[in-house]
Amino acid sequence: MKKKIAIAMGGYSSEYRISINSGNIVYKHLDHDLYEPYRVHILKGEWFVVADDDTPYPINKSNFTVKINDKVIQFDCVFNTIHGTPGENGLLQAYLELIGIPQTSCDYYQSALTFNKRDLISVLRPYGIKAATNYFLNKDQEINTKEIVDKVGLPCFVKANRAGSSFGVTKVKTEDEIISAAKTAFTEDDEAIIESFLDGTEVSVGVITYKGKVLALPVTEIIPDGEFFDYEAKYLGKSQEITPARISEEDTKKVQDIAIMIYKKLKMKGLSRSEFIFHEGEPHFIEMNTNPGISQASILPQQAEKAGISLKDLFGSTIEAALNQK
């Protein structure tokens, strides 16, 4: 009998449209001979299954079931493609764990940790992971711009601490710009992190569990048309993404080994993508995406293709890993 797979997409953040694209890619490429997939939209106001004729059927949140044509559907697994809250910050994972449904992304603790830029870097530093100097802000605290500049220098990046797809990110070149940049960050989160500028080559490393083994995918070099890899660069084609990256074999292995080490130390599972900048010859960690985009414009599918892994095989392996951990 085919396993019933709920493809969770949407979410409560600015990234919900990206997530819908990712979820539809999974629905399209998943092997329908092996699985019975359902598109589950998880939005602030309602959770519902979208049928092939676009009819919405509400999800029963008490047990994550849906009633279609008088038949109650119980899902065997959730393929989590939600970027941002609640699918990438641990909330959905915790809910599914409580009701006993396996899901494809990392567990709730790892999800919450990796979604918090400050906390993740604090955990990784003792392992020798290099990262930019940073300064943390709460929304209600007074902003001392001189103290910030003294610590991180200029230019710097002001970011929402818990947001993805470069929403709420501003590159700041003068001290006078810090206040307005912080306000932009606070539209996405009530915490902000300010990081020193790292000059160098930016790369992205996909690390996945594929057929039972942790695997680093070919490294992608990112060259944004603008000043940094923002939303438009990521999803509107305003960047060059070169796979494999134009770095030495030694540097490729170095950054892949670090990405795998992070994945294993954090006890990750499923799909992930970590970003680094080679600054002064050494990879500096930027962030980790535990539900990376898998739309046509996304990096991870490009990397999988270069590794000879089809999306059908990638998604199938991800589901089987989740089912086997039930």
Curated annotation (Swiss-Prot):
Its cofactor is Mg(2+); Mn(2+). Pfam families: Dala_Dala_lig_C (PF07478), Dala_Dala_lig_N (PF01820). It comes from the Bacteria. Its EC number is 6.3.2.4. GO terms for biological process: cell wall organization; peptidoglycan biosynthetic process; regulation of cell shape. It catalyses: 2 D-alanine + ATP = D-alanyl-D-alanine + ADP + phosphate + H(+). Binds 2 magnesium or manganese ions per subunit. PROSITE patterns: ATP_GRASP (PS50975), DALA_DALA_LIGASE_1 (PS00843), DALA_DALA_LIGASE_2 (PS00844). Mg(2+) 2 binds at E287, N289. The keyword rRNA-binding does not apply. One of its GO terms (cellular component) is cytoplasm. It is an enzyme of class 6 (ligase). It is found in: Cytoplasm. Mg(2+) 1 binds at E275, E287. InterPro entries: ATP-grasp (IPR011761), ATP_grasp_subdomain_1 (IPR013815), D-Ala_lig_Van_CS (IPR000291), D_ala_D_ala (IPR005905), Dala_Dala_lig_C (IPR011095), Dala_Dala_lig_N (IPR011127), PreATP-grasp_dom_sf (IPR016185). Belongs to the D-alanine--D-alanine ligase family. Cell wall formation. This is D-alanine--D-alanine ligase. The lineage of its organism: Bacteria, Pseudomonadati, Bacteroidota, Flavobacteriia, Flavobacteriales.
